[in-house]
Amino acid sequence: MKYYIECTVNKKDPLTGRTIETDVDLSLPYLVDVEPSQMNDEWAKARLISEYWADFDPATPAPRMWWETDSEKDENNDHYTLIVYTATDDGEPDFDNMAAGASMDAWEIWKEKKHEH
């Protein structure tokens, strides 16, 4: 079955303190063909993690939570959301039918990576 993937990131502007949501340019296609029995939140979480690492700039320091910093504010801890919608016959997302989703901040993604090794 065809699914359409949408991924966004919420970044906090350090000057204004405002949170800005932007689309993530996916490293893999937005339209995917996946067996319906395999499409679930775990699939979405795995894809979200892989998209984060595909977009990750090694020059960026690891994310830190507020209790790990002197300023008592999160650092490099952007929040990512990936939503999977069923796709229409012409490959467009059917926004009324969400198939799966995942939402994690960068700190959680790094924590997952530590458990892999």
Please tell me what each predicted stretch does:
Residues 1-2, 111-117:
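Short intrinsically disordered terminal tails
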Residues 19, 23-107:
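Acidic, low-complexity, intrinsically disordered interaction modules
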